[in-house]
Amino acid sequence: MKNLVKGIIRKAANVALDKTTPLDTNVAEITPYTFRKTEFPRKRINLLVPSVNPEHVFGGISTALKFFEELAAKTGYDRRIILVDSPPTEEARKKYGTDYTFLEPEQDSTDRAQIVPYSNRYGRQIGVSDKDIFMFTGWWTAHCAQEACEEFEKKEGIAPRPFINFIQDFEPGFYPWSTRYLLAEASYKNRYPQIAIFNTGLLRDYFKLNGFRFQHEYAFEPVLNASLKEELYKAGDTLDKKKQILLYGRPGTERNAFNLIVAALKKWVWMQKDIGEWEIYSAGEQHEDVDLGNGKVIHSVGKLTLKGYADILKESYAGISLMASPHPSYPPLEMSVFEVKVITNTFANKDLKDFNDNILSLDNISPNCVSARLMEICDGYTPKVPHRIVNKDYCENADIFSFISEIKELL
């Protein structure tokens, strides 16, 4: 009987070894692009972006589109937007249809402004000429374009014009040390000439500190959204503030450290003497409300309209906005000019303490430190705070891409 049991166990073990889990070796983002040679009469800037659907056009994509449109306008070059992740919705076609012609990858056209959906690209080729210039934002679009250009040069003998790499964060940091980390990093090291456009000088300096070099480098600085600026300039010499804390809350984006904020607040609610008088709101991404204990809850208001965002900025006394990245992110800057006393974090060479007096930039971002500093802020609450414009470059700069004339000479 004992030998029978041993035999059954050995057999079961062998079966388990035979049934190994299938490996998933695919990196979905890098489904290849394929180019075919075509003739085109003029220089054309090709922007590779995931999507132009309204629900996706904010933050990085919005900034890239703004630069792309200004670059095309000031150089006089033709425009083509290639959509690599999401096909355009009817709403997107309606929005862009007056200025752009929508084409399939197989179609050639001399229209001066084109949009080509290319998310469904297996076995499909896009026409490319020696006058095409590629601009990408997002490491996977850079990777795929760079590899496609290498294959195109081998096949047709046409080397690409300098790439425009629109860099809005250190993207390897979006992942653990892994395949995607290395692929993102490799996109900065491609052998072809690249013009790097950095979203902030802080980000450019971080790349330099870490040994990355490009043939040409430019940086632009953040500027306050025009609608927020209008609301800011309508405010008087003082702002009425509530006992209210505004969080930049994006649980779905790890680099915004939402769980760390929650951990700090769960300590703070037991430290603040007048805790019953305070309310906490989270803006940026819709999520369920979070119970902090001691009768306090984080109320999620999701993604607000610009008017709604301006209103909550005006009335909030304190804020927390974290970013585990060398990029400053916009919310702490926006909060600070609306006289919100905001806690943020340093990261490598990033330190926002000199932006204005409303920013508290912490080197130690542990929950104990954050909760202690938040209590100090809240203990100093006053219902009216003085308001004046101290960051005029941030609020009023109408020419953030002033270097475009130099880029034209490189293309």
Regions found by a protein language model. Give the residues of each.
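Conserved catalytic-core segment of nucleotide-activated headgroup transferases in glycan assembly
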Residues: 60-63, 181, 190, 195, ...
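Short hydrophobic beta-strand element within catalytic cores of glycosyltransferases
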Residues: 341-345
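A short, active-site helix/loop in glycosyltransferases that binds the activated sugar's phosphate group
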Residues: 144-145, 174-175, 180, 192-216
